[in-house]
From Swiss-Prot:
The keyword Hydrolase does not apply. Its main location: cytoplasm. The lineage of its organism: Bacteria, Pseudomonadati, Pseudomonadota, Betaproteobacteria, Nitrosomonadales. NCBIfam families: fabZ (TIGR01750), PRK00006.1 (NF000582). It comes from Nitrosomonas europaea (strain ATCC 19718 / CIP 103999 / KCTC 2705 / NBRC 14298). Keywords: Cytoplasm, Lipid A biosynthesis, Lipid biosynthesis, Lipid metabolism, Lyase. Involved in unsaturated fatty acids biosynthesis. Catalyzes the dehydration of short chain beta-hydroxyacyl-ACPs and long chain saturated and unsaturated beta-hydroxyacyl-ACPs. It comes from the Bacteria. This is 3-hydroxyacyl-[acyl-carrier-protein] dehydratase FabZ.
Length: 153
C-alpha cells in the first residue's frame, strides 16, 4: 500500500481493526514496516490539536511522556497481534504489564513526527518483552523496555 511517496504497511483504517483504542487514545497513525516476530516501525504525527496540549503545558505545550510510552506499547501490540495472527474479537485483550529502563531524553512538541521503533527481545509463556524507542528527526527522545501479555476476557 502506498500513501504519497512513503511505503505504508498499515494505514489508520487497518490499525483500528486491530487495536481497541479510539480517539483520543489511538496513538499510532501509520505502520511503515513490520517484520513478523521481530520489529515494527510506525508513526505518530503530533498535532497542536491534540487534547492534552491545552493543559500540558498551556504556554509551552509538550507531549506527556506517558503518552509516548503508550504509543510505543500500541506499536508493540500491533507487532505481536500481526506476528501471532491474533483475530479481532478473539476473546482476548492485549495488556501493557511492565516497563523498565525508561528514559525521556528530549521533549516532543506540536509538529513533531514520532518514529516508533519496537523490537521483540523475548517471548515466553504468553509474555512478550520489547526494546522500544521513539525518535524525532533521527534523535532518540524516549527509550524503554516494555512487557505485554494477552489475556482472556
Amino acid at each position: 500500500m502506498k500513501q504519497g511517496d512513503r511505503q505504508t504497511v498499515m494505514d489508520i483504517h487497518e490499525i483500528l481493526k486491530y487495536l481497541p483504542h479510539r480517539y483520543p487514545l489511538i496513538l499510532v497513525d501509520r505502520v511503515v514496516s513490520l517484520e513478523s516476530g521481530k520489529r515494527i516501525h510506525a508513526y505518530k504525527n503530533v498535532s497542536i490539536n491534540e487534547p492534552y496540549f491545552s493543559g500540558h503545558f498551556p504556554h509551552h505545550p509538550v507531549m506527556p511522556g506517558v503518552l509516548i510510552i503508550e504509543a510505543l506499547a500500541q506499536a508493540a501490540a500491533l507487532l505481536t497481534i500481526r506476528s501471532e495472527n491474533m483475530e479481532k474479537d478473539n476473546g482476548q485483550v492485549y495488556y501493557f504489564v511492565g516497563i523498565d529502563a525508561v528514559r525521556f531524553k528530549k521533549p516532543v512538541i506540536a509538529g513533531d513526527q514520532l518514529v516508533l521503533k519496537v523490537e521483540i527481545t523475548r517471548q515466553l509463556k504468553g509474555i512478550w518483552k520489547y526494546a522500544a524507542c521513539a525518535e524525532v528527526d533521527g534523535q532518540v527522545v524516549t527509550e524503554a523496555q516494555l512487557m505485554c501479555t494477552a489475556r482472556a476476557i
